[in-house]
């Protein structure tokens, strides 16, 4: 929060949360309705993560996640897409989900016997971190705010 303390006089807070070893796109807001829309499990907000695994991700496990029938801790997880990251080793996996459970991406891979060594949220609710360097931020445009409100 120190990074954005001079961005506004409003009280802002993160939408959702990251664990200590996760990085990437984090939205901050002063709007409780947007926060609720983006974090409530029933609202199906999609998130795309780049997961770096400790070893190669087997094709059979990729197919298991792609099947659409996958559970973690007895609860169904909705995986929209999963693929190897283009141009990277087979230990680099992109996974798109719309489940908001705590540490769910790490748990998905752990269920299959993989450890996530780095996790980066690349897209959240249609917003991308493209062209924003790590440790930097920007204000949303009016259009982006309206798009979030319409989700």
Where are these regions (language model features)?
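Basic, flexible Lys/Arg- and Gly-enriched helix-loop patches that mediate nucleic-acid binding at interfaces
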Residues: 1-151
